[in-house]
Swiss-Prot record:
UniProt name for this protein: Immune protein Tsi7
Native organism: Pseudomonas aeruginosa (strain ATCC 15692 / DSM 22644 / CIP 104116 / JCM 14847 / LMG 12228 / 1C / PRS 101 / PAO1)
Subunit architecture: Interacts with Tse7.
Function (record text): Immunity protein that plays a role in preventing early activation of toxin Tse7. Protects thereby cells from Tse7 DNase activity.
Length: 306
């Protein structure tokens, strides 16, 4: 058990499961200096940190994204760049692997994101790869329509995926691309930007939000998309979360909330994070996760977790 992560670990991403239970993916600062690919998954349970499995249970691969799913059981899933998956929760810890042959990740490129849609995991990556998890260790490609034509040398890819249900899923990524899936086939939507989009949020207000490079923030649904112009924010935006009736947006230096079409920087209070990066919301709390800073927000007050 650990009292603090930050003295020896740097956080990559994380996900909140309950108000008193969350998971964070990190790397050891010492091992990272040796350029060794690795990750640790650490559980935060009622204020105590515990490395998943045994204390020496280091994953020999890099985690890129995380989510919590409800099917076939409720668990946290951590996705690796080469399609590795670490599953933890409900009394079970195991690893899975997405298709990695030449016609899949092995020949098409790295994975970039994973998300829960209607309780089920969906993963996306370069070359517009998309996979759905149908059962434990049963991931199948569902990229019909989005897959580039044979022989194409264009560099394309999805950075993030989200949806309102299995028949309305969106993926965003390189060149500002926006694609929509109806349960059978993907089709492109006209995007108002050509900048890379890095995050997506299908919000409770019925809109889909996406963000990315140079302060880009989009709103839309189906075939209509617009830029929410910002005069004061031009840094890259990395993460989105819907919390307590509002959209929260994170850059590397601040967390914002969208108020009246404008991004307003949140006030963390007396103690400020050095960095921000990833947002995760569940069960009445919002977490801001960065390499050496983890804060939790209950709708009234920000509290440092680590």
């Amino acid at each position: 058990m650990l009292k603090k992560l930050s003295p020896i670990f740097s956080n990559i991403t994380g996900v909140v499961r309950y108000q008193d239970l969350a998971y964070v993916a990190s790397v050891s600062d010492e091992i990272q200096e040796q350029n060794i690919a690795h990750s640790y998954v650490t559980e935060w349970d009622c204020g105590t940190w515990c490395v998943a499995g045994e204390d020496d249970d280091m994953l020999p691969w890099e985690i890129v994204s995380a989510t919590v799913v409800h099917e076939p059981v409720e668990q946290a899933l951590f996705l690796g760049a080469r399609g590795q998956v670490f599953c933890m929760g409900s009394g079970d810890i195991h690893e899975e692997q997405l298709p990695d042959g030449d016609d899949a990740i092995g020949g098409r490129g790295n994975m970039r994101g994973v998300a829960c849609i209607d309780g089920v995991a969906y993963a996306c990556g370069m070359d517009r790869q998309v996979y759905r998890r149908f059962d434990e260790n049963d991931w199948r490609a569902i990229d019909t329509g989005a897959r580039p034509p044979a022989g194409s040398e264009a560099v394309v890819g999805f950075e993030a995926i989200g949806g309102f249900g299995a028949r309305e899923i969106y993926a965003v990524g390189w060149d500002g691309e926006i694609w929509q899936y109806d349960g059978k086939r993907w089709q492109p939507r006209e995007s108002p930007t050509n900048l890379i989009l890095t995050a997506i949020c299908c919000a409770e207000d019925g809109s889909v939000y996406a963000c990315g490079q140079a302060g880009t923030l989009l709103r839309g649904r189906n075939d209509h998309w617009e830029i929410i112009a910002q005069d004061d924010v031009d840094e890259d935006l990395w993460s989105l979360a819907w919390f307590d009736g509002a959209l929260y947006v994170s850059s590397a230096t601040a967390v914002y909330t969208l108020v009246g079409g404008h991004l307003k920087e949140v006030d963390f209070g007396d103690e400020q994070p050095q960095r921000c990066f990833h947002l995760s919301a569940a069960d009445g709390v919002l977490w801001s996760i960065a390499a050496k800073d983890i804060f939790s927000f209950d709708g009234q007050q920000w509290t440092r977790i680590d």
